[in-house]
C-alpha cells in the first residue's frame, strides 16, 4: 500500500495538469507556427512559466486499490500482483489464467 501522502501528491499533480493543459497546448501550437527564432524563444519562456508539477510527464498511473505506481495494467487500472490475486479469485470477468 502506497503512503497516503504520495497518493495525495499525485492527485495534486493531476489537478495542476488539468488546470494548465490548455496553456501548454496553445504555447506548443504557437511555437510550430512561428518562424523567427526570437519569437520562438519568447514563447518557450512563456511555456516554462507554469509549475513543474503541471507537466503531464510527471504523472504516474497508479493502482486504484493499492496506489502502487509500478507494474500497472492500463486495461484494468490495477498493479500486477493485485490483478493476479483478482484473477485467481475469479473477480475479473473474461480474464483467464494461463496454463501450458
Swiss-Prot record:
GO terms for biological process: translation. SUPFAM superfamilies: Glucocorticoid receptor-like (DNA-binding domain) (SSF57716). The keyword Plastid applies. It comes from the Eukaryota. Keywords: Chloroplast, Plastid, Ribonucleoprotein, Ribosomal protein, RNA-binding, rRNA-binding. GO terms for cellular component: chloroplast; small ribosomal subunit. GO terms for molecular function: rRNA binding; structural constituent of ribosome. InterPro entries: Ribosomal_uS14, Ribosomal_uS14_bac/plastid, Ribosomal_uS14_CS. The keyword Ribonucleoprotein applies. It is found in: Plastid, Chloroplast. Binds 16S rRNA, required for the assembly of 30S particles. Part of the 30S ribosomal subunit. NCBIfam families: PRK08881.1. Belongs to the universal ribosomal protein uS14 family. PANTHER family: 30S RIBOSOMAL PROTEIN S14 (PTHR19836), SMALL RIBOSOMAL SUBUNIT PROTEIN US14M (PTHR19836:SF19). This is Small ribosomal subunit protein uS14c. It comes from Nymphaea alba. The gene is rps14.
